Amino acid sequence: MSGDFFFGVFLFLLLRWLALLFNLLAFPRLRPRPTPPKPTASLLVPARNEAENLKRTLPALLRQGALEVLVLGGLAEDGTAQAALEAAGNPPACRLLRGAPPPPGWTGKNWACFQLAQEARGEVLVFTDADVLWEEGALGGLLE
């Protein structure tokens, strides 16, 4: 191999190195955007005759990190309210609402959801049924 070949390779590598050095010094660095705060969420559960489901669902809901978990189960006939209290263990983030009978023209679940929405304090209202099992971090993914 001739000296011209090695000189050409050396010159090529030198130019590539200088281009890399120029790019490192001349191009601006991108800064990560500050992440906006996540909105507060209220998990709302209209429950009627859902005592067995609440025993499984409520602990998973409480682990989601919501501002509050509201359960409306006042008109149930199977001890839904008592099951909710036992499953929750009475944490401050969980409230049980008794509810009122629906006025004329309202159906049961619509009226229950309306009452829950009136009591909720979160910026985002997330309605869920008592038989839905939430995976860890599901609420965080929903709010992103």
Regions found by a protein language model. Name each.
Residues G73-A83, A100-P101, V132:
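A conserved acidic beta->alpha catalytic loop
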Residues V45-P59, L75:
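Active-site beta-to-alpha loop of glycosyltransferases that engages the nucleotide-sugar donor
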Residues D78-G79, D129-E144:
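Acidic donor-binding/catalytic loop of UDP-sugar-dependent glycosyltransferases
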